[in-house]
Amino acid sequence: MLLINRQDRERLGLSQALEACRCMTPQGKRLKAKYRYFGPDERRLLKAELSAVDQLIEYVKHHPLELRNAQDQLAHFRDLRGTVAGLSKSRTLDLTELFEIKQAVRLLHKLLKIPGLLAKADITIHPLPELEALLDPRELGTSGFYLYDEYSSRLAALRQSRAELEKEMEKAQGEERAALLRQRSQLLAGEAEEETAVRAVLCGQLAPFADRLSDNLQAVGQLDFRLAKAQMALRWGASKPDLLEAGEAVILEQFHHPVIEDHLSARGAAYERQTTTLARGTTVLTGANMGGKSVTLKAMTLSVILIHLGYFPPAEYAASPLFGFVSYSSDYFDTTKRGLSTFASEVVKIRDDIRQARQIPGFVVLDEPLRGTNPQEATALVGALGRFYASLPGVLVLATHYEVPAGAGIRHLRLRGIQAGDLEEIMEITKDPPPDEEAVRRIEALMDYSIETVDGSAAVPTAAIRIARWLGLDSGVFEHLEEQE
């Protein structure tokens, strides 16, 4: 399950990332909107889902004409849940609903003519020749629907009588025309009555096939959804993830966050892709401010979540065991509606995660937790959290500025950040800082976002004071800083 509130889902960028998964049918869009999570006991189902998407990727690459044909059909499917439900409950459908069913049957027939696509998608669509015959008794092959004369000899006779009467009306005048109009009204009433009876009989004939039609429409949604996943994977350059055994380490090679990468690219900035391994227990991620910790956490969490949702994650290679839940918590909490402080909200979220983690292995991500309390107690709590999760079967990834001592089950990673020599170089070149935007751009350009493993006792490189001085922070502040030293 996903334990992510709406605000953190937005900050993680999950919904925005999945905008690249472009379903065309109402059925496919519903499947996407469900956020179907595959847990440890659904490994076989997830493996089948990922394999189908993988096969579709190859199909999409090599069969562009068939793909375009399939998309042309998918684009015309409508949401027929109410119509099909009414049919199964013996409700008499109106002409519009009958037209929609005929159109769906016709579209299904066309998809059946692309068997290679259905096979690669691992989708079964059952032929419906009985429905085709009932809805198109003249075998015209048209998409429109009409209550054909073949449905009722009485209806055909009434229509014929009306047609003859209308010819007479063309020449009639006065009282004669008025009498003919009265006759025509009677014929029209008879037609309407007979058409209602015909629709009732026709719906009774269609009703036995309602379940099969419903199954086919669900299959169309699955086809659409898997096809959208395959095309998204191609756009991202993503590969099929490997599913590992419980307790094995998560592996992410050259992973990235597509939304953030697109945003940076749009303003001419580069995004550095990263590689890491997240072992069972606690992983502590450190690094200076502006060093990219939050982006790194978002990107790695997004990849793990997407695997559990049946997508290919945005990485050159990814492998993960299946977790019972994935939880992501950023440093922002919408507390106004609950009447809780930021600290209280964080503790409640951490409490709930721990309750889950005691029962099932989870993947828990905390981005600088407990910033809202004093540093001494926060350091103690964060350190205790790290040690607590170290003994659990899941994974905790913790980004923090607080010290977390080394120990069994605790691993320390660091974003390299700005190297001292590089910082000194730009400060020497430009004694006076450039305009603010240019200064920030230069600092960002110096950042090394690669992830390295460090000894738990290694110092975190810092450049905050030098950067603050270079950016023109009032010298009086530094005088007080020197006094403290």
Residue locations for each model-derived region?
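ATPase nucleotide-binding head domains, primarily ABC-like/P-loop NTPase cores
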Residues: 246-485
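Conserved amphipathic alpha-helical "coupling/scaffold" segments
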Residues: 1-151
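A structural signal for well-ordered alpha-helices, especially hydrophobic packing surfaces
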Residues: 50, 54-57, 61, 81-88, ...
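Extended, charged alpha-helical coiled-coil/arm scaffolds that mediate oligomerization and mechanical coupling
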Residues: 128-218, 222
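Glycine- and acidic
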Residues: 62-63, 202-207, 283-287
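Charged, amphipathic alpha-helical linker segments immediately N-terminal to NTP-binding catalytic cores
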Residues: 215-261
